[in-house]
Amino acid sequence: MCNCKYREDKLHHECGVLGIYGVDDAAGLAYYGLHALQHRGQQGCGIVTVGPNGEFHRVKGDGLVTEVFNETSMTKLPGKMAIGHVRYSNAGCKGTENLQPFLFHHNSGDFALANNGQIVNYHQLRDELEDKGSLFQSSSDAEVLAHLIKKQGIDKELPRIHSLKNALNMLDGAFAFVVMTGRRIYACRDKYGFHPLAIGKIGEGYVVASETCAFDVIGAEYIRDVEPGEIVTIDHHGIRSQFYAEPERHAMCAMEYVYFARPDSDIEGCNVHNYRKESGKILFQEAPADADIVIGVPDSSLSAAQGYAEASGLPYEMGLIKSKYVGRTFILPTQSLREKGVKMKLSPVRSIVKGKRVVIVDDSIVRGTTSLKIVKMLREAGAAEVHVRIASAPLKYTCYYGVDVHTPEELISNRNSVEQVCKLIEADSLAFLSHEGMLAAGHRSDLCLACFNHKYPTKLYNE
């Protein structure tokens, strides 16, 4: 887990993955696909391709997709197969060595891999592998799979698919892997189904991606999701499926719907915008407010705010405007400058909020500092009352499955009641969506709500 001196008052996802098979200029399509997944990770990115002679090529670096790749670097990535990755560091510290995809050389054939998620028994597996002579090139938990694959192949002389199946069965936690050999791509998802991974068709080839929004930008057609516990093999035969493990449960991360995924993505048959809008409607049913207008915190909360307004009959207004030009890192050297951070990112529309009783809808509250500043900002702009409504339950506990949730002590709802949080953020009222409401918004019978209810689907090896 990376430790930053100054941490934003928002959650971050670990990463996004992409795979392209059987398409001319696979790297070019990977570039646009990764750009569509940029919201899942902004610290670094990379692409690996397999050239016409079976050789592997890689370009990776710190920064956004548009910063790492240019016309010159793209010419270094020939071939009809590619995998790519965008990263926000979680398990493993910052550093170029931790940027994915990883590339490995082995006597049974080179391969590359990239992952979205977090392996909870990483430290135990790494210790065992290092005791047996494995040398790690990074501190990323994703590298464990590569060493397990190699170890299986050496010890048991297994075909690659059997080595992969055995290796995946040794992992516990959340993962959505893309693994590329010289001839095929494997798409693998953990048996709990924590994070999304979808398959699409493009021309005579195929694409896999963390979100379906990547399909739209490259002109691919959605086929289906990779199922929990499934390995999908993509090669000249087309797509083939086998399960390395029986699915445990459909424990899709609730925050994928609430915050991380793009509104135009579909996750397991549910459109993200529709989920958020429905959550806003349910939020009104659970926690109505006597108010004049409804506004949302840009951008991820706008759909929920629309739903709340629709259900309440109140006007939906653009009461907050988000600046497009604030840098993504935004780490300032003094407290006084950091206090101005929210005002640089968000500005109230005075003519809309002045004299109004305002319902402000947000997706979540992490530390509460941003909520406090937004409430103050609206009051300074003339709002008569500010009623805060959150389109998820109180965030109380650490995530071990690929979301950079702060330590429990940093989470304002971990140590305070709803009434206390309301006072701390200086709102006139505060209400959160219930656990039941989060499920109902997507017509789901199950989601991973561990960061809300402390019910973890897996054993926690590091507790």
PLM features: residue spans?
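Conserved short alpha-helical segments that host acidic/polar catalytic motifs at enzyme active sites
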Residues: 1-228, 233-291, 297, 385
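Flexible loop/turn segments at secondary-structure boundaries
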Residues: 25-27, 90-91, 121, 186, ...
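A conserved beta-strand->alpha-helix junction
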Residues: 69, 138, 143-146, 316-327, ...
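Generic beta-strand/beta-sheet core signal
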Residues: 114, 180, 188-189, 200, ...
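Secondary-structure transition/capping motifs at alpha-helix termini
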Residues: 134, 155, 286-292, 310-317, ...
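Phosphate/diphosphate-binding loops
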Residues: 166, 213-214, 221-222, 226-230, ...
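PRPP-dependent phosphoribosyltransferase catalytic core
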Residues: 168, 183-184, 201, 219-225, ...
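Short, glycine/charge-rich flexible loops or terminal/linker lids adjacent to PRPP-binding catalytic cores
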Residues: 313-358, 369, 396-406
